[in-house]
Amino acid sequence: MSADEVYSRVRKIVSDQLGVEDDKVTLEANFQNDLGADSLDTVELVMAFEEEFDLEIPDEDAEGIATVQDAVNYILSKKAA
């Protein structure tokens, strides 16, 4: 799975879950500061990532996923393992 493919899928999930335009979901975008997510939204995003990519993200790891790039990097690291 390529980084571009992961980014595309993460971008769609974030856009759908948070109701923001695709073009606002950049790699640098912070879920809370830039995209308006609250803590519940963040939990729901992590759950959506788990389902989409068939992986489990422990709470301590989820706390470190603040940006779109963080999510992409985390997913890539788990899928490469």
From Swiss-Prot:
It comes from the Bacteria. Signal peptide: none annotated. GO terms for cellular component: cytosol; membrane. Pfam families: PP-binding. It is found in: Cytoplasm. PROSITE patterns: CARRIER, PHOSPHOPANTETHEINE. One of its GO terms (molecular function) is acyl binding. Pathway: Lipid metabolism; fatty acid biosynthesis. Keywords: Cytoplasm, Fatty acid biosynthesis, Fatty acid metabolism, Lipid biosynthesis, Lipid metabolism, Phosphopantetheine, Phosphoprotein. The modification O-(pantetheine 4'-phosphoryl)serine is found at residue 39. GO terms for biological process: lipid A biosynthetic process. Residues 4-79 form the Carrier domain. Its main location: cytoplasm. The keyword Mitochondrion does not apply. The keyword Lipid biosynthesis applies. Carrier of the growing fatty acid chain in fatty acid biosynthesis. This is Acyl carrier protein. The gene is acpP.
